[in-house]
């Protein structure tokens, strides 16, 4: 195997314009980077601020678009010919690899933003030749323009590909608005070589030079049957969507490969049945490409010359296309009908015995023993080939749990087809959030548990008079205002802008698993929920004849809003915190406990929860949480400052509560974190906790965490803190805190015009 090599240039750009030269990150690579809070700003978007993609998609002639996609499937182009005269396999792979980057731990990845167009994804080894798939789609994208995003089009093309080959899909929803730059928030791994996994596994593999396959001829790693993949990653190698098709680190071991498959597919939200359905269903079509050694393949799109116009992986082997194509290095066509739906994949998997062999490109693959050549050639109708499989295909036979499912699918083809249609739909829509976001004539109406269903509003909503009366009742309970603020934040701040999961709607804060999370399993939550449930019952009983009701989800948010208003009033400022009813309460039966467990925060710096790890400091966790909440740096700053003085630390500690009047919405946090009369010293070796003392007397004044002191230490955050800590900053602080609070409370209110990201005002 060639020496491992970094996939990017080892030398910095010598350009002395356009941002070239030595940068801050070169001097201080560990410095906190706020860049992910500034992504996808209006300045990068070519459309007007009032452009409504949902309205544009709904104006689309959807079935005309599908007709054009159907025609494209068999319109083979000389510059990139279609295997078997049909592009279906290519477009299925494109859609799969667009959506399949999703992972459950942070909701990042997935097909929701069309990120496959940008580096690094457009240049991953696993995405070789998908640059051509997108160019084949360009005439259709050009024709329909802004009415169909790339994000939607790439996935719809995969759906139409299945239909064009005789498979009945479960449905399709549009609504994925494009972004216009690479998403820099995603941790794809720490490796610096393609196919490397020496960071994500403690005893991983160093990777390969350029484009290529790992050598399976080297001794297998001792831990491929036991190793644990680093969180939040799902893929087993840098540059792969899923697992190595040759087996773990190139070792052709189907049983060990099954372990990697279960980890990877599980981390994208798929159970064993869905995993088997996706692999067996997807591999019922098309082929892989390994006509010759990967040494013939040139650099990826991001490294290719200007004259290549965004295309990469130029192939020097003969024609470099069609029968001479090289992508994975594996040369496998799974069935004798690669352009028609069948259950032949499962039939062959169990009918034949398999022996290890090599592809023309030198990759490990498996060939059927003692049988005749029945597999058609993709370009020469006079040729036939022996049936072949990937190591990861054989995992479905040799892993006991997968085998049981696969044999059931083999015996019940209708059940297999239904399972594949549902798993494929889930794959494409996992990061779209609730079904209320679905648009288009083929969007299914069935509620599915992984969509986190919430009942539709079935009662008259409270009006302004009701809201005012409920606020008074809430504040008259005698509970501390911080209880209501903490509960509302705990409920709403589960939202993730990445996959549109979580949020206050549904009131799942009262259900398992959220109620038992360490960050929530505190006395204040039980006290608050008990009080609010009584208020809800009393109100609903009193107004039952009017048809009005208030959900607990609404009441939790309203209580937080009432407490913030009262805290501002006690600080000398009158302000109304917006509140819009319309949330509903989900049931425990509508809540998939295992799935929701992935939303539990490792850290929530807004509540001073969590500690630094050996690799991640508390302030990095804070910025990551802010990104999941779609917050800007000013919004993060004002929220931390406000939540501290409102005394909302998860455990009731006084760390960072830099005020002599907790519970009042003052700008004291900022004035005190910026106070030069305070000297700070680490209390626990500089890990997380600090003590602030009077610089003259040495008397203790405050304690604070890294998530607090970063607002005085980090130059950019200090600049923001100075705005709110100035003598004229109090009024702006309250106004901005209420705006950011309102945004977080409504992040999951997809029924409101301008909800979520669009509500950002700072």
UniProtKB/Swiss-Prot annotation:
Q: Which reaction does it catalyse?
A: H2O2 + AH2 = A + 2 H2O; 2 H2O2 = O2 + 2 H2O
GO BP terms, alphabetized: cellular response to hydrogen peroxide; hydrogen peroxide catabolic process
Which residues are noted in the entry as heme b-binding? 283
Q: Which domain of life is it from?
A: Eukaryota
Q: How is the cofactor bound?
A: Binds 1 heme b (iron(II)-protoporphyrin IX) group per monomer.
Read off the InterPro entries from this record.
Catalase_peroxidase, Haem_peroxidase, Haem_peroxidase_sf, Peroxidases_AS, Peroxidases_heam-ligand_BS
Q: Cross-referenced SUPFAM superfamilies, in alphabetical order?
A: Heme-dependent peroxidases
Family matches, as Pfam families: peroxidase (PF00141)
Which residues carry the site feature described as Transition state stabilizer? 93
Required cofactors, per record? heme b
Q: Where on this protein does the Tryptophyl-tyrosyl-methioninium (Tyr-Met) (with W-96) crosslink form?
A: 242-268
Give the record's subunit note.
Homodimer or homotetramer.
The record ties this protein, via HAMAP family, to: Catal_peroxid
Name-wise, this protein is Catalase-peroxidase
Per the record, the gene is katG
């Amino acid at each position: 195997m060639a020496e491992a090599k970094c996939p990017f240039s080892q030398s910095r750009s010598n350009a002395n314009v356009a941002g070239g030269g030595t940068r801050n990150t070169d001097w201080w690579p560990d410095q906190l980077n706020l860049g992910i809070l500034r992504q996808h700003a209006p300045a990068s978007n070519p459309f007007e601020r009032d452009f409504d993609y949902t309205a544009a998609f709904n104006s689309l002639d959807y079935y005309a678009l599908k007709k054009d996609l159907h025609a494209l499937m068999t319109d083979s182009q000389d510059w990139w010919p279609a295997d078997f005269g049909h592009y279906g396999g290519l477009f299925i792979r494109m859609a799969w690899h667009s959506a399949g980057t999703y992972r459950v731990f942070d909701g990042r990845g997935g097909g929701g933003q069309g990120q496959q167009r940008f580096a690094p994804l457009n240049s991953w080894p696993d995405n070789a030749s998908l640059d051509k798939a997108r160019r084949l789609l360009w005439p259709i994208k050009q024709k329909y323009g802004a009415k169909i995003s790339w994000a939607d089009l790439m996935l719809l093309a995969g759906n139409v590909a299945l239909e064009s080959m005789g498979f009945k899909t479960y449905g399709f929803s549009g609504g994925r608005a494009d972004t216009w730059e690479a998403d820099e928030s995603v941790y794809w791994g720490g490796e610096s070589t393609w196919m490397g996994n020496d960071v994500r596994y403690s005893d991983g593999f160093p990777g390969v030079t350029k484009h290529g396959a790992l050598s399976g001829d080297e001794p297998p790693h001792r831990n491929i049957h036991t190793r644990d993949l680093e969180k939040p990653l799902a893929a087993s190698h840098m540059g792969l969507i899923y697992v190595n098709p040759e087996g773990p680190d190139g070792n052709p071991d189907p049983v060990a490969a099954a372990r990697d498959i279960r980890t990877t597919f599980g981390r994208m939200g798929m159970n064993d049945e869905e995993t088997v359905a996706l692999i067996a269903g997807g591999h019922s079509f098309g082929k892989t490409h390994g006509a010759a050694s990967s040494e013939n393949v040139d650099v990826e799109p991001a490294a290719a010359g200007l004259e290549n116009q965004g295309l990469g992986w130029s192939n020097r082997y003969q024609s470099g296309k069609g029968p001479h194509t090289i992508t994975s290095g594996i040369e496998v066509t799974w069935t004798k009908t690669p352009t028609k739906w069948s259950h032949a994949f499962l039939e062959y998997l169990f009918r034949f015995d398999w022996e290890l062999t090599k592809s023309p490109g030198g990759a490990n693959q498996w060939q059927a023993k003692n049988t005749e050549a029945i597999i058609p050639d993709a370009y020469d109708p006079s040729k036939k080939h022996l049936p072949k499989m990937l190591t990861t295909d054989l995992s479905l036979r040799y892993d006991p749990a997968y085998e049981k499912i696969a044999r059931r699918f083999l015996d019940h083809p209708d059940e297999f087809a239904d399972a594949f249609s549902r798993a494929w739909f889930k794959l494409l829509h996992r990061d779209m959030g609730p079904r209320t976001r679905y648009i288009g004539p083929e969007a299914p109406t069935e509620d599915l548990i992984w969509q986190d269903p919430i009942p539709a509003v079935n009662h008259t909503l409270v009006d302004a008079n009701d809201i005012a009366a409920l606020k008074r009742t809430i504040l008259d309970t005698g509970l501390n205002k911080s209880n209501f603020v903490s509960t509302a934040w705990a409920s709403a701040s589960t939202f993730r802008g990445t996959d549109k999961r979580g949020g206050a709607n549904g009131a799942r804060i009262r259900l398992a698993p959220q109620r038992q999370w360490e960050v929530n399993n505190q006395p204040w939550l039980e006290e608050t929920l008990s009080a609010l449930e009584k208020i809800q019952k009393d109100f609903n009983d009193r107004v039952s004849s009017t048809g009005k009701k208030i959900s607990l989800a609404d009441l939790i948010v309203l209580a937080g809003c009432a407490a913030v208003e009262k805290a501002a009033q006690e600080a000398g400022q009158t302000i109304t915190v917006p509140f819009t009813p319309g949330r509903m309460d989900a049931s425990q039966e509508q809540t998939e406990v295992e799935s929701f467990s992935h939303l539990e925060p490792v850290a929530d710096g807004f509540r001073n929860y969590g500690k630094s790890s050996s690799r991640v400091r508390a302030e990095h966790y804070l910025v990551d949480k802010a990104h999941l909440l779609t917050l800007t740096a000013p919004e993060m700053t004002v929220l931390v400052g406000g939540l501290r003085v409102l005394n909302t630390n998860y455990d009731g500690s006084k760390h960072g509560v830099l005020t002599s009047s907790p519970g009042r919405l003052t700008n004291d946090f900022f004035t005190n974190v910026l106070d030069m009369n305070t000297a700070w010293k680490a209390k626990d070796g500089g890990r997380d906790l600090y003590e602030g003392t009077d610089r003259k007397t040495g008397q203790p004044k405050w304690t604070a965490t890294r998530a607090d002191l970063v607002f005085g230490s980090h130059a950019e955050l200090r600049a923001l803190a100075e705005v709110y800590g100035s003598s004229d900053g109090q009024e702006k602080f309250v106004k901005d805190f209420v705006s950011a609070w309102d945004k977080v409370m409504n992040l999951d209110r997809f029924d409101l015009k301008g909800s979520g990201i669009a509500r950002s005002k700072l």
